[in-house]
């Protein structure tokens, strides 16, 4: 029996995923990495070969890298580090990521969605999972017949109309802005669409326009505006506003090319080969709910199925990926028995506000791009710099202007490993440990121990009071940098593994300074250890005195 035949015979699976685009493929990849069984279906006869979302932001790259899914994309895409704005003879630029963000990825990656999908499908194939085409979910219900697999799901083949019934624990609707899963759940998709038509094309271009390495927003001499940026294999994507608000099906490629040339005047532009083009109208929508039930959530919406916006800042793909990174580890943790089902309610609680922020920002950016005032766009790009790149996305419960708090992205600081003396990033430590363990969704516990000669007793007591679960990895970070001093402290106890110890000796103890707002070279004499719990999606799950840590941070 072939792999495809074996897949089609699976009548009981953990997750059914509807939609074989990048969001659905990422969900399937994470699920199988976490030990969950999946079937993924797509209504289309074949995958997309060109077009659609092509920006992968810095924060998304961090998460893909952490999951072992970034290598092929990084080798292929075009790296962009600046936004630029051009109007007649005046040009200006804004850095993609703020200088203070500590990360390997201070750039976005411009790469075709078909390449992203191909990379994710290749990784998924290593787990003997393929997208089943052209299949869809024609109906589903929680019927109470099987407590372990509570969902009855009917799959329908769009080629011959044949059907098959399977049982599942969860259903993920990753089926786009026109989501049939969302419609079957009768969840409203609130928002508005513009009547203004825009053209977009991917092409090989010869041009005298000088800025070929940035995301370039261009205001032409006749009021036409365009956006142009590099892609993989010397391709260029051009997006341009069209003057025609009529039937977009009547707009031809020549019109898009003509308006792009007008926007770029007086520069010469020649489209030598157009690989893909389309016409779109800006729509900004958010689903009122992301799940069917708060009592026992089993059906979830992800990606464009629960939010859509303009392609101006490439937020769609990245927001969808953020949904999946937030959700799948929670499902895995619940299914492993380490968390209550109520943890799944936090998916909508955390991700719905993010989509609302994306829409609010998108409306302002679109208006600024179409405005005659150059300063408006520059101001907004600087204002939303952290959010656009994804580094500023947070699940905070409040708006207090505290340096670091629960819900924020965990910083990727550099430390020195005590045992090996090697300099290493926190994210690289965590990725390596994820690769070496079967507990792929594991948490990480950072204990900031200050001067370990003063705090060792408190650190040991903390570990006696808090039993570290198997799904949590420990890292003790100390400002003590003399290996001999640390060795002496470790020799006097048996509770702490030397492999846990890292020295905060880079940039004057950047971990302590960056993660403990009140830290200032211990001038206040406080050496109480601070605990920081980092979730599988690399957000901070809890921060506070180590002596107060418990597993209560899990919903």
What are these regions (language model features)?
Residues 2-14, 18, 33-34, 87-90, ...:
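Helical substrate-recognition/capping region of FAD-dependent monooxygenase/halogenase enzymes
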Residues 2-395:
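Core Rossmann-like FAD-binding/catalytic domain of the broad FAD-dependent monooxygenase superfamily
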């Amino acid at each position: 029996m072939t792999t495809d035949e074996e897949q089609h015979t699976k009548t009981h699976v953990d997750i059914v995923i509807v939609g074989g685009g990048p969001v659905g493929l990422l969900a399937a990849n994470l699920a199988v990495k976490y030990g969950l069984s999946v079937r993924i279906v797509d209504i289309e006869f074949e995958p997309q070969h060109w077009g659609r979302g092509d920006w992968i932001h810095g924060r998304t790259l961090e998460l893909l890298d952490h999951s072992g899914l970034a290598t092929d994309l990084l080798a292929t895409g075009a790296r962009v580090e600046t936004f630029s704005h051009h109007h007649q003879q005046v040009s200006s630029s804004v850095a993609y990521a703020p200088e203070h963000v500590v990360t390997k990825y201070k750039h976005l990656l411009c790469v075709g969605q078909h390449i992203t999908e191909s990379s994710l499908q290749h990784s998924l194939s290593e787990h003997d999972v393929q997208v089943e085409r052209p299949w869809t979910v024609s109906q589903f219900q929680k019927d109470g017949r099987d407590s372990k697999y509570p969902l009855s799901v009917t799959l329908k083949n769009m080629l011959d109309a044949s059907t098959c019934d399977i049982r599942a624990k969860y259903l993920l609707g990753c089926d786009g802005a026109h989501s049939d899963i969302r419609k079957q759940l009768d969840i409203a998709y609130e928002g508005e669409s513009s009547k203004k038509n825009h053209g977009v094309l991917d092409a090989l271009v010869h041009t005298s326009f000088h800025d070929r390495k940035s995301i370039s927003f261009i205001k032409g001499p006749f009021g036409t505006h365009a956006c142009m940026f590099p892609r993989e294999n010397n391709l260029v994507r051009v997006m341009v506003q069209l003057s025609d608000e009529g039937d977009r099906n009547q707009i031809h490629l020549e019109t898009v090319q003509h308006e792009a040339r007008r926007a770029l005047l007086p520069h010469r532009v020649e489209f030598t080969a157009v690989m893909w083009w389309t016409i779109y109208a800006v729509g900004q929508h958010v689903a009122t709910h992301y799940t069917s039930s708060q009592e026992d959530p089993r059906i979830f919406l992800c990606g464009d199925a629960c939010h859509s916006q303009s392609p101006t800042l490439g937020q769609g793909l990245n927001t969808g990926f953020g949904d999946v990174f937030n959700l799948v580890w929670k499902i895995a943790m619940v299914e492993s028995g380490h968390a209550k089902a109520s943890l799944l309610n936090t998916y909508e609680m955390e991700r719905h506000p993010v989509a609302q922020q994306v829409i609010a920002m998108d409306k302002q950016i679109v208006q600024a791009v179409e405005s005659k005032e150059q300063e408006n766009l520059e101001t907004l790009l600087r204002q939303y710099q952290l959010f656009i790149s994804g580094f500023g996305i947070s699940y905070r419960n409040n708006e207090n202007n505290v340096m670091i708090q629960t819900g924020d992205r965990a910083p990727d600081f550099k430390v020195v490993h005590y045992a090996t003396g090697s300099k290493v990033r926190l994210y690289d430590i965590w990725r390596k440990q994820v690769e070496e363990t079967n507990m792929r969704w594991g948490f990480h516990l950072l204990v900031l121990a200050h001067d370990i000669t003063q705090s060792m007793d408190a650190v040991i007591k903390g570990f006696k009071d808090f039993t570290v679960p198997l799904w949590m990895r420990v890292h003790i970070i100390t400002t003590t940098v003399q290996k001999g001093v640390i060795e002496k402290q470790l020799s006097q106890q048996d509770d702490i593994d030397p492999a846990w110890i890292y020295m905060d000796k880079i940039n004057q103890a950047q971990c302590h300074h960056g993660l403990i707002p009140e830290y200032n070279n211990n001038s206040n004499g406080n050496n109480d250890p601070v605990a920081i719990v980092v979730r599988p999606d690399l957000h901070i799950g809890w921060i506070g005195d180590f002596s107060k840590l418990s597993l209560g941070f899990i919903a």
